[in-house]
């Protein structure tokens, strides 16, 4: 069946391009705002001393806050998926494409959330943490746009959007998954190291 734009592109692809692409842009702005208070509020309210002296490890503190962010984003993405899946009552959907888009968006936001947690641990001012997170996330998302074509292939390996784009096209490469996992792990470990240094120095 041909004729309308959605039918030509495929209903699932048409919706994914509209919904998930828009969601990725919105969450690029929202995630820094959500994560900027995770640690900075602890500094400002002077509860960090009590938190670090509690009978839990720094790793548990950071992972708890980070997993809370992941669960929040997972809930938002799940809501989007449910809304799209409701259309399966009337149209045929490509569930594989839907799942790869959802996974790609979750991995993208997981990386930005880890970055936000790290910058939140650097300052007691939430606005500064949010700004640094947004600036850094935007740089990693758009980094491939800033370089000439002869270096673009190399630079694209560091672009979050380049890796996310494969998921958006329904392609799930192990390299893309590993990139996002290493990206998030790096910033989580840096946050733990930051708190460890602070605890040692008092």
Q: Regions from the language model: what does each represent?
A:
Residues 41, 85-89, 121, 145, ...:
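Transmembrane helix-loop junction
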Residues 1-2, 22-30, 132-139:
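Hydrophobic alpha-helical transmembrane segments of multi-pass membrane transport/permease proteins
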Residues 1, 7-9, 13-26, 64-126:
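Secretory targeting signals
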Residues 18-41:
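Long, hydrophobic alpha-helical segments
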Residues 38-68:
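Helix-loop-helix units of permease transmembrane domains in multi-pass membrane transporters
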Residues 1-14, 135-202:
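Terminal transmembrane helical anchor/hairpin motif
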Residues 31-35, 83, 114-115, 191:
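Hydrophobic/aromatic residues in alpha-helical transmembrane segments
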């Amino acid at each position: 069946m041909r004729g309308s734009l959605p039918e030509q592109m495929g209903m699932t692809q048409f919706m994914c391009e509209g919904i998930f692409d828009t969601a990725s842009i919105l969450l690029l702005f929202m995630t820094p705002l959500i994560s900027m208070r995770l640690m900075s509020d602890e500094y400002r309210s002077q509860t960090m001393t009590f938190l670090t002296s509690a009978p839990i490890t720094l790793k548990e503190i950071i992972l708890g806050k980070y997993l809370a962010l992941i669960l929040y984003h997972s809930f938002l993405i799940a809501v989007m998926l449910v809304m799209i899946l409701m259309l399966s009552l009337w149209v045929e959907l490509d569930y594989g494409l839907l799942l790869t888009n959802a996974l790609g968006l979750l991995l993208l936001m997981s990386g930005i959330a880890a970055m936000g947690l790290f910058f939140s641990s650097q300052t007691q001012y939430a606005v500064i943490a949010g700004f640094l997170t947004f600036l850094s996330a935007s740089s990693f998302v758009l980094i491939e746009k800033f370089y000439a074509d002869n270096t673009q292939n190399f630079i694209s390996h560091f672009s979050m959007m380049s890796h996310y784009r494969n998921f958006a096209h329904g392609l799930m490469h192990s390299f893309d998954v590993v990139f996002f996992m290493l990206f998030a792990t790096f910033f989580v470990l840096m946050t733990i190291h930051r708190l460890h240094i602070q605890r040692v120095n008092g």
